[in-house]
């Protein structure tokens, strides 16, 4: 990676954190006015996602000399975020224009499309090959982690959902989200166990952190929705 690309990535990282901090500060300032906070959240969400989409498609364009797999990976992640943006736009229209509860709704179709596309994008990222012994060790460790997390998800999230008094569609979609988060978690673990070229470390660290944040916020949202506290 040349100096120009390093500076560009550094500036992009600074900009991303500046936007995140600004969003958090404004949300805190609007905490006393639930309606304004809702409007702010519904409007800024798609705007931020459009910036992310532009960045991912630019990454695909800039990596055209690094192989087709790299380009496909960035394109898939860009398409994944495009579906998220469509979901947020649909959510905003339902909530602000029609004053209806957007969950469950058609917005969930777009949100759910994000998970397999994003996980597939991670899969297409080029990585160095492991030795046979390392590969078996990694498979065993990943299996243990996924089994443990799967049991925890069943005990604390999936099983309570199945006995919840909420409508069937709400429970069904909530369980699908949990399962897809599990798919995303698998992609994250695979990302952590992969050996990438040094030039990919920075962007992939940000992607990994974003995946962790998404999984955590998803679970908080599901719990609040099912408990009626959202």
Language model regions located:
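Polytopic alpha-helical membrane-helix bundles and their juxtamembrane interface segments
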Residues: 1-230
